[in-house]
Amino acid sequence: MYDYIKGQLTKITAKYIVVEANGLGYMITVANPYSFTDCVNQQVTIYLHQVIREDAQLLFGFHSEEEKDVFLKLISVSGIGPTTALAIVAVDDNRGLVNAIDNSDITYLMRFPKIGKKTAQQMVLDLAGKFVEAPKEESSKPPKAKQQGNEQLDEAVEALLALGYKATELKKIRAFFEGTSETAEQYIKSALKMLMKG
């Protein structure tokens, strides 16, 4: 099992990033690949969780140990796999998640992709009181330069599809942001907030 990887970030796609370490390129699935845009060709530390299946070995990556801890707690719940847990982590609203679990807010939890009523109830049963709320880390990232709006929006929609959101949901999101100019990362963050509001 791997705890973390240190290496050069060489590639970003809508579904994963590639980190080169010791001459090997590791394909790492992350919640929001575009949050790493400023790190391309730089040294990064990515916290890892490895999933070994009959047909594949998968690496899931996180910005921090806290983010990884949330992911690990989520996949301990029956009915939540790594992809669904990653979609929940992508929303980047730990306070909202913890409040929903601790207050049995099933409706809020069901807004996440692939979370039905039974799974939401199971989340409450399994995770209530298990999260220690950490203060949100101040971002040390410099502000990103805005790029071509439509291309960035396309990349954001592709990343949201990879997280399990439906094309019909994203059609409204695309229409809302059409004509604006943001980075893919910002589109994803804004879209996730909108999707969670319902």
From Swiss-Prot:
- Tell me the segments the record calls region Domain II: 64-142
- Annotated region Flexible linker: the residues are 143-147
Mind listing the GO molecular function terms for this protein?
ATP binding; four-way junction DNA binding; four-way junction helicase activity
Keyword rRNA processing applies:
no
> Could you tell me the superkingdom of the organism this chain comes from?
Bacteria
Q: List, alphabetically, the Pfam families matched.
A: HHH_5, RuvA_C, RuvA_N
Q: Where is this region: Domain I?
A: 1-63
| SUPFAM superfamilies with a match to the protein in the record | DNA helicase RuvA subunit, C-terminal domain, Nucleic acid-binding proteins, RuvA domain 2-like
Give a yes or no for keyword DNA repair in this entry: yes
One GO BP annotation of this record: DNA recombination
- Compartments it resides in: Cytoplasm
Provide a GO CC annotation, any one.
Holliday junction helicase complex
Q: Tell me the keywords, alphabetical order.
A: Cytoplasm, DNA damage, DNA recombination, DNA repair, DNA-binding
Q: How does it assemble?
A: Homotetramer. Forms an RuvA(8)-RuvB(12)-Holliday junction (HJ) complex. HJ DNA is sandwiched between 2 RuvA tetramers; dsDNA enters through RuvA and exits via RuvB. An RuvB hexamer assembles on each DNA strand where it exits the tetramer. Each RuvB hexamer is contacted by two RuvA subunits (via domain III) on 2 adjacent RuvB subunits; this complex drives branch migration. In the full resolvosome a probable DNA-RuvA(4)-RuvB(12)-RuvC(2) complex forms which resolves the HJ.
Note what the entry says on domains.
Answer: Has three domains with a flexible linker between the domains II and III and assumes an 'L' shape. Domain III is highly mobile and contacts RuvB.
Q: Which family does it belong to?
A: Belongs to the RuvA family.
Protein name per Swiss-Prot or TrEMBL? Holliday junction branch migration complex subunit RuvA
Q: Which organism is it from?
A: Streptococcus equi subsp. equi (strain 4047)
